[in-house]
Amino acid sequence: MDAVAAEPVVAPVLPLPAQVRDLGMQDYVPVWRAMQRFTDTRDEHTGDELWVVEHAPVFTLGQAGKPEHVLAPGEIPVLQVDRGGQVTYHGPGQLVVYPLLDLRRLRIGVRDYVCKIEQALIDTLGEWNIIAERRDGAPGVYVGGAKIAALGIRVRRGCTFHGLSFNVAMDLEPFHRINPCGYQGLQVTSVLDLGGPSGMDAVKAVLLDQLARQFGLVLQPTSALPDLSLPA
């Protein structure tokens, strides 16, 4: 009888721990530099983390960003950064989450990673009966044609940084000073404008739960903050 090759044994993917760090309100650059350092120095033993933050007002241009999409920034600073995507705005009342995940350990590719983030946002909005959708070729989440969440990611050595921004209860006027995500005339909206809660904590709790469900994570909140100091 011919020998039958044994099927390779694949260990089950168990829920993986991930620390959650709530950074509160922070300027953009110190957080950006900190997640770069975290990603550059991590190895296969480094645990995954989710950083949650609100940023002081800033426009960021991704690697594909074109300066002509910044129409009239006024007093708001404009930064060229190393994420994917075009131009977007960050400001108070917007929930920003930076997943610092090892995709190899999670056994997913970049496309699945993006889809899971979008689905977590869609399911979060569903908690308040807000029907949202994704668009082919235009990462992010939309409600009735208006963008409510933007994605801008970077993957280095299989590990993610940068992430998502979710308009909860914010002044949307600065979006009129740019072509959001490079699309002229793209409308934006917020959770509050669509009848959802104004409280950041309520939205934050639901979104973190949905991200944990999508990625198979056990969240471990910690009060310790990353080193946000800037090199001299």
From Swiss-Prot:
Protein name: Octanoyltransferase
Catalytic activity, as annotated: octanoyl-[ACP] + L-lysyl-[protein] = N(6)-octanoyl-L-lysyl-[protein] + holo-[ACP] + H(+)
NCBIfam families tied to this protein: lipB (TIGR00214), PRK14342.1 (NF010922), PRK14345.1 (NF010925)
Positions annotated to bind substrate: 83-90, 150-152, 163-165
Keywords for this protein: Acyltransferase, Cytoplasm, Transferase
Assigned EC number: 2.3.1.181
Enzyme superclass (EC): transferase
Segments forming domain BPL/LPL catalytic: 44-219
The organism's place on the tree of life at top rank: Bacteria
Described purpose of this protein according to its UniProt entry: Catalyzes the transfer of endogenously produced octanoic acid from octanoyl-acyl-carrier-protein onto the lipoyl domains of lipoate-dependent enzymes. Lipoyl-ACP can also act as a substrate although octanoyl-ACP is likely to be the physiological substrate.
Molecular function in Gene Ontology: lipoyl(octanoyl) transferase activity
Residues annotated as the enzyme's active site: 181 (acyl-thioester intermediate)
SUPFAM superfamilies assigned: Class II aaRS and biotin synthetases (SSF55681)
GO cellular component entries: cytoplasm
A Gene Ontology biological process term: protein modification process
Annotated site, Lowers pKa of active site Cys, chain positions: 147
Subcellular compartments: Cytoplasm
Pathway: Protein modification; protein lipoylation via endogenous pathway; protein N(6)-(lipoyl)lysine from octanoyl-[acyl-carrier-protein]: step 1/2
InterPro entries: aa-tRNA-synth_II/BPL/LPL, BPL_LPL_catalytic, Octanoyltransferase, Octanoyltransferase_CS
Family: Belongs to the LipB family.
Further remark: In the reaction, the free carboxyl group of octanoic acid is attached via an amide linkage to the epsilon-amino group of a specific lysine residue of lipoyl domains of lipoate-dependent enzymes.
